[in-house]
Amino acid sequence: MLAGKGLHLQRENGRRETLSGDGTIAVFGGEEAISAQLQDGLITDLNLMTRRGAWTHDLQALRLQGEQLVENDAEVLLLWNAAQTAVRVDAGGVLHDIAAGNGLLVENEPGPLHLQSQRPALLYLGRLNARCR
């Protein structure tokens, strides 16, 4: 969940989860029956979905303030800035400024990413890799 007061999920096995804008991630298959109830008002969420036979994926929440180095080992990397401040990304010497509520898609560019934020930031990193073709 990127913005809003929260969301309650009821999984088909009876387990309940509450998502808020704190970086908590819910992982489930698309065929699982899940119901949701808003806590208070509308939300903005981020869903990362792939065809399991063709791709693998991982989603990570990363808290950032100052500088941090992240190794990109994915064929496709999505960086989503869920913070209220801009984040600077140096990908192989190419600088990208990701404004609040925006993302960056990096394709077939493995190697280190230098991340920088002057204020506390929350980034979501989605890593996608193709299964054997």
Question: Where are the language model's segments positioned?
Answer:
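Jelly-roll (double-stranded beta-helix
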Residues: 1-133
